[in-house]
Amino acid sequence: MNLNATILGQAIAFVLFVLFCMKYIWPPIMAAIEKRQKEIADGLSSAERAKKDLDLAQANATDQLKKAKAEAQVIIEQASKRKAQILDEAKAEAEQERNKIVAQAQAEIDAERKRAREELRKQVAMLAIAGAEKIIERSVDEAANSDIVDKLVAEL
């Protein structure tokens, strides 16, 4: 009978041990396991949200980069057009200035040419009078001289 009492005692001790474990040890272990499961689930959902946010941020960054490239292209085109406009304006202004300078130079040349012709006519007239005086060997008065010079200038 010894054997039966020992088994019965061990069975009672085991039942008490199981009851003790179910009451005092099992609930904290289950709470810790459930807490850890919840933390893992939260971490996974947080990682999922972070991945979605990252994808959204990358899409936004790509869109902004495309917009920036488009704006840069527009700015480059505007700058190129402005450069061409400035060059055209500068060329037109330079052409006007050149034409103005050429016109002024031509006017100065014409005025100098007229003045030189007048001077030459007067000198030719004076030489002609001097030659005529020497040939005639007489002196012509100043009023007659002036009339002769004017007639010669008009003829030349």
UniProtKB/Swiss-Prot annotation:
UniProt keyword Glycoprotein, yes or no: no
Subcellular location: Cell inner membrane
GO MF entry, a single one: proton-transporting ATPase activity, rotational mechanism
Residues passing through the membrane, by range: 11-31
Keywords, ordered alphabetically: ATP synthesis, Cell inner membrane, Cell membrane, CF(0), Hydrogen ion transport, Ion transport, Membrane, Transmembrane, Transmembrane helix, Transport
Predominant cellular place of this UniProt entry's protein: membrane
Membrane topology value: Single-pass membrane protein
GO cellular component, one term: plasma membrane
Organism superkingdom: Bacteria
CDD domains: ATP-synt_Fo_b (cd06503)
Family: Belongs to the ATPase B chain family.
Stated role: F(1)F(0) ATP synthase produces ATP from ADP in the presence of a proton or sodium gradient. F-type ATPases consist of two structural domains, F(1) containing the extramembraneous catalytic core and F(0) containing the membrane proton channel, linked together by a central stalk and a peripheral stalk. During catalysis, ATP synthesis in the catalytic domain of F(1) is coupled via a rotary mechanism of the central stalk subunits to proton translocation.
Assembly behavior: F-type ATPases have 2 components, F(1) - the catalytic core - and F(0) - the membrane proton channel. F(1) has five subunits: alpha(3), beta(3), gamma(1), delta(1), epsilon(1). F(0) has three main subunits: a(1), b(2) and c(10-14). The alpha and beta chains form an alternating ring which encloses part of the gamma chain. F(1) is attached to F(0) by a central stalk formed by the gamma and epsilon chains, while a peripheral stalk is formed by the delta and b chains.
HAMAP family xrefs: ATP_synth_b_bprime
Record's protein name: ATP synthase subunit b
Lineage: Bacteria, Pseudomonadati, Pseudomonadota, Gammaproteobacteria, Enterobacterales
Gene designation per UniProt: atpF
